[in-house]
Amino acid sequence: MYNYVEQGLITIKNYDLPEKLKRNTKLHHVRKNKKKLGRSIEERPKEIDQRNEFGHWECDLVLGHKTKDDQVLLTLSERMSREFLIIKIPDKTAASVMNAFKNLRKQYSEHWNDIFKTITTDNGSEFADLANLEEVSKTLVYYAHPYTSCDKGTVERHNGLIRRFIPKGDCINNYSLQQIIDIETWCNSLPRKILAYHTPDEIFERELDKIYQTA
């Protein structure tokens, strides 16, 4: 009967019939396993999952228009305080990512090892060189399971906050550095129920004070 309808031999439409099966003729591509870049999240101490210790971060990128000349946002979230850092970088290359971390290390100088104890990120090629931090500091870098965003759910959720201001598809180039700073400030000034209605900034500054006082 469906064939008769398609050929116009019966004056009813497909949507008049109870159900018409559709066959998906698209080719299905099997994902290839990504190359393991370094230490797996499987090796990360389980205590980090409890969020009781300061200094454990998750790292990601937020893309805009996805063109070669569009800038991207490097994002980092500290797991205990939920402090969120947004760094505008020229592109999604490993070199640009590492340059951003180089500047971040200069900012926190001798306190870096206490503030950035671990970093968990994904297996994207843009983070291929991140494990090199272990050669110049005590920071340990862990790589999430491939295609498993929940391994770094904190930074993923914060990336969602960015989308309130920068919708998917918008060019990052169109947003000034001050606008990016304003977004970061808004995120870190937002009281959180999980933080007993403190803000990430309040918790982060409290932990920094502890580090600076004992240095």
How would you describe each model-predicted region?
Residues E134-V141, H145-A215:
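Charged alpha-helix within mobile-element recombinases
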Residues H65, D69, I86-E110:
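Active-site beta-loop-alpha junctions of metal-dependent nucleic acid enzymes
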Residues N113-D129:
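Acidic/histidine-rich, metal-coordinating catalytic segments
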Residues Y2-Q50:
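Basic, flexible linker segments flanking DNA-binding modules
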Residues E43-F84:
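An active-site-proximal beta-strand-loop segment
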Residues S81-L85, E110-F116, F165-I166:
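Short, surface-exposed connector motifs at secondary-structure boundaries
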Residues M1, D60, R82, F101, ...:
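Mobile genetic element proteins and their domesticated derivatives, centered on retroelements
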Residues T75-S77, L85-K88, T118-D122:
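Short, conserved beta-strand edge motifs with alternating hydrophobic and charged residues
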